[in-house]
Amino acid sequence: MPTLFIALFIVFCGLAGTPAQAAELPITKNPPIPDFQNRPQDVIPYDFDAPPQGMFRTITTAEGFDEELGFRRTHEIVPVKPTDRFRPDTPAVFIVFHLHQHYQGFQVFGRCFPEAVAGLDPTVMIGQDAMHIALEDESGYLTLSPPQGAWKPGRYRVEIHVGEQVNEMSLMGTMRFTITAASGD
């Protein structure tokens, strides 16, 4: 049987004629890797002093948060009254975020520092919070409570860290918010 198949193949090739040869492509020189990969004009430096990017789809400060049922029947955290300006009597400042897909659980940390607040040292942390993000979580929040019961007017900086612990490599970005001076009632 195999010899019959081979004989038919030879006859068929003979009847069809010789197949046309493809034109040979010219040999091109190999371009250096920097010409097409890791080009300096394509590299945008990452700004750790700006709101985090990368794994964060959105991140914002807000007066509160709400939990809604997402379209995949997951719990979705949404900001309530997003703003970066708060009153001194605000009970807490919330940082609400939505994440891109991730393949393992981790923690998101927020460390609050007074950036420009009269009477407070900008190098001393005044508050922090952490949230464990499970594999199925797509959103979350951090809660920052006022130091000594009330916020002092001024500008505050929140370092956002991601990982298992806070260190110099876990910093993803910085959020800022302002506590306005109390208006005369």
Regions found by a protein language model. Name each.
Residues 6-16:
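Bacterial N-terminal signal peptides
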Residues 18-21:
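Sec/Tat signal peptide C-region and signal peptidase I cleavage site
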